[in-house]
Amino acid sequence: MVNWQVLYNRKKFQKRQLPQKAAATMELLIAEIEQSGPVRGNWPNYSKLPNNRHHCHIKKGKPTYVAVWEDIGKNKVKLVEIIYAGTHEKAPY
């Protein structure tokens, strides 16, 4: 089975700026995307967004932290880009 490759948008995704709990949860999400692909219906508040984007919550409370990723693979290439991880207020959706 071919795993998915995960890329990072360096401008918008900076894991070191996340709180420790959110960063740890983000690591789990990335591992799951690499193993099983971008559709993660088992994650809290997961939803598929327009333009092949997906999002879920990685830390509840105030502030809430979310992750946004995009399936950018073409012609059966399994490629996902993490485009954002941060507070809900600044999420690109």
At which residue positions do the language-model features occur?
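Arg/Lys-rich, positively charged N-terminal/basic patches that mediate binding to nucleic acids
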Residues: M1-A31
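Sequence-level motif detector for i,i+2 pairs with an aromatic at +2
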Residues: M1-N3, N51, V77
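Enriched for short, Lys/Arg-rich terminal
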Residues: R16, H57-Y93
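A short, surface-exposed loop/turn module that caps and links secondary-structure elements
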Residues: A31-G61
